[in-house]
A protein has these predicted regions:
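Conserved functional hotspots at enzyme active or ligand-binding sites that engage polyanionic ligands
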Residues: 1-106
Length: 106
C-alpha cells in the first residue's frame, strides 16, 4: 500500500460501538499499520476540509464521494481487504492542502 491508494478496510465507528468495511485513502503505511482517512458517499454532510472525489476507472469509486480528512485512523494493515484504486495527482495535492488546513500546519 502507498499514499493515495484507496483500499477497503474495516473502519471503527467514532464511538467505538462497532466497525464497517468501507473505502479509505492511505495516508501512510508502515510494516505493521496503515494510517487512513475514511471515504463516504454522504456528500450532503461535507465539511470544509473534505475532498470531493468524482468516480473514475483510476480511483475505482462508483459514486461521488468525500474523503473525510477529520476521520483519520491508524489500523492494523491486515484489516485492509483489497485495493479499489488510486487518487490522481491532483486529488493527492488537494488532500495534502486540506490536511494542512485541518491540522493547522504552515
Amino acid at each position: 500500500m502507498a499514499k493515495g491508494d484507496i483500499v477497503l478496510i474495516t473502519f471503527p465507528f467514532t464511538n467505538l460501538s462497532g466497525s464497517k468495511l468501507r473505502p479509505a485513502v492511505v495516508l501512510a503505511d508502515t510494516s505493521l499499520d496503515v494510517t487512513v482517512c475514511f471515504v463516504t458517499t454522504q456528500i450532503g454532510w461535507q465539511e470544509n476540509t473534505d475532498v470531493l472525489l468524482i468516480p473514475s476507472s483510476i480511483n475505482g469509486l462508483r459514486k461521488q464521494s468525500l474523503i473525510r480528512t477529520s476521520k483519520i485512523a491508524t489500523l492494523d494493515r491486515t484489516l485492509a481487504m483489497g485495493l479499489l484504486g488510486k487518487l490522481s495527482k491532483q486529488d493527492i495535492d488537494n488532500l495534502d492542502k486540506q490536511l494542512k488546513i485541518l491540522l493547522q500546519l504552515p
